[in-house]
Amino acid sequence: MQSSLPQFTFKWPKGPEAIILTGTFDDWKGTLPMVKDPSGAFEITLPVTFDSPSSKFYFKFIVDGQWLPSKDYKVNIDEGVENNFITEEDVIKQRENGSSTLVPESAGLAVSKNAPLIEPEAEKRAKKLRKFKIKRVIKTNKQTGERSIFSQEVVELPDSEDETQQVNKTGKNADGLSGTTTIIENNVGVNEEKAIKPYEENHPKVNLVKSEGYVTDGLGKTQSSESRLYELSAEDLEKEEEEEDEDKGGGKDTSTSADAEASEDQNKEPLSKSAKFEKPEEKVPVSSITSHAKETSVKPTGKVATETQTYETKQGAPTAAAKKIEAKKATRPSKPKGTKETPYKGVQKNPAKNGGFFKKLAQLLK
């Protein structure tokens, strides 16, 4: 709102660095700095009052720290002190002319309005654009396809950072928004966290939930993945021991079912009869055993079948007993499955400890 009081524009030619206007209006305290225009001249407009048409308005300029009167205005000398002054007539004259002719350098310039002389620093700061960088973590569920923002962080960028560098760093995310975004995907809807290096310290890590898989064995029993791994390791151990027994024992058998059958028949037969066939290889011709072994496979089951046929012709064993032994040796029973708590230990047994193969076979055929 413009003041109804008459206004007057005070001017100073270009040259100094800073000029302050003071006078009776501020009790000579030097509180009104003048504004420097693009040409380098100084000017300021303020309302003036006069008690009577003959009253005077006293003022003076502080030029770069020195109190100086201007030669372009009227001068009054009071006790050796020079001060400038204007009257009501000077104000009316400047208003009619539209501009003052006192200073040639500033002729034709618009008269400045009463505005804040110094722009506050707070307003300067408010005009500056503030830059922010948004960091998001987006969680995606593969089953439903739903995407949700897991976390979001807003970081204010310092003024020294170049905006183009920030655009190159962040770019555009999958959701079309600017900022650094990490997408998390999972199959079962469980929160999983991938590497979020820039700000992982500011966010708690998401605990990973493992869904334990189950497998079904040949017997229809469901086992966990951990017990299945333990079972496979036991089978590998059994295979290694079987290979060692084949290399060392030659024609010795490692089947646990045949050992159990032989032990039962051995308990039934008297010890005197079993002693007669302690070394059966001396009574059976070597040529007959060798010829039969060539026709069968190298596996232990083939050897057992060959030797059973040889004793059937030599000793005259019952046909039913021979077929029974053949069927048991040809079809290996399924091995018991071990668990994590009670692993299967039957593979560590060695039939050689309980007696020779021919000794047991002689007892069965007798």
From Swiss-Prot:
Disulfide bonds: none
InterPro entries in alphabetical order: AMPK1_CBM, CRP1_MDG1_kinase, Ig-like_fold, Ig_E-set
Acidic residues composition-biased segments: 233-247
Chain segments annotated as transmembrane: none
Stretch list, region Disordered: 159-180, 217-366
An MF annotation (GO) of this entry: protein kinase binding
Keyword terms: Cell membrane, Isopeptide bond, Membrane, Phosphoprotein, Ubl conjugation
Membrane topology of the entry: Peripheral membrane protein
Alphabetical GO biological process terms: signal transduction
Coiled-coil segments on the chain, per record: none
Phosphoserine: modified positions: 160, 288
Gene3D superfamilies linked: Immunoglobulins (2.60.40.10)
Biased composition (Basic and acidic residues): 265-284
Cross-link (Glycyl lysine isopeptide (Lys-Gly) (interchain with G-Cter in ubiquitin)) at residue(s): 314
One term under GO cellular component: cytoplasm
Annotated compartments: Cell membrane
Record PTM Phosphothreonine, positions in chain: 216
Pfam families in alphabetical order: AMPK1_CBM (PF16561)
Main localization, broad class: membrane
Function description: Involved in G-protein mediated signal transduction and in the regulation of polarized cell growth in pheromone-induced cells.
Family: Belongs to the CRP1/MDG1 family.
Name assigned to this protein: Signal transduction protein MDG1
Lineage: Eukaryota, Fungi, Dikarya, Ascomycota, Saccharomycotina
